[in-house]
Design a protein with these regions (language model features):
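Bacterial N-terminal signal peptides that target proteins for export
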Residues: 2-19
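C-terminal motif of bacterial Sec signal peptides marking the signal peptidase cleavage site
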Residues: 24-28
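Extracellular attachment/recognition segments
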Residues: 33-143
Length: 143
């Protein structure tokens, strides 16, 4: 009987050790989007297809379908913060981000929750953040 208990303890210890080893490997695998995060300023000159309509609506990128590769949506890395130059010259009443898993904006949706956070809004800049551990592509609309 004591021998049986020792075998169970050894098996249990081995199982725990194997589980901890798997956790350690899983935590160290790959550089997810957070491993490639960035905080940066996005000047208007970097957004080749941005436009300001006569109605005072500014768009960083067009909606799909894309007319050229230079109009692809901005890479919006996980765990990153972006300060956009504000082209309106006034504090926008509305800041809307559209997110897609595709650079051409297909299958996009309105950003919300931790994937699209508005940090600061002023006459000069709009600062947004992606707190998710996920890479998206972004289209920003200010009004």
């Amino acid at each position: 009987m004591p021998e049986m208990m020792r075998m169970r303890r050894r098996a249990s210890s081995t199982s725990v050790a194997a589980f901890l080893a798997i956790l350690a490997l899983a935590g160290g695998c790959g550089d997810g989007p957070c491993g490639n995060s960035e905080d940066r300023v996005v000047p208007l000159s970097e957004l080749a297809c941005n436009r300001l309509s006569g109605a005072g609506v500014w768009e960083s990128h067009p909606l799909p379908p894309m007319v050229s590769e230079e109009c692809e949506w901005l890479e919006f890395r996980g765990c990153s913060r972006y300060a956009f130059e504000n082209p309106l010259g006034a504090v926008p009443a509305s800041v809307v981000g559209y997110l897609s898993f595709d650079p051409d904006g297909r299958f996009s949706t309105v950003g919300s929750g931790n994937s699209f956070i508005v940090d600061e809004v002023s006459d000069d800049e709009v600062v947004i953040r992606n707190s998710q551990n996920q890479l998206f592509y972004l289209r920003l609309v200010l009004q």
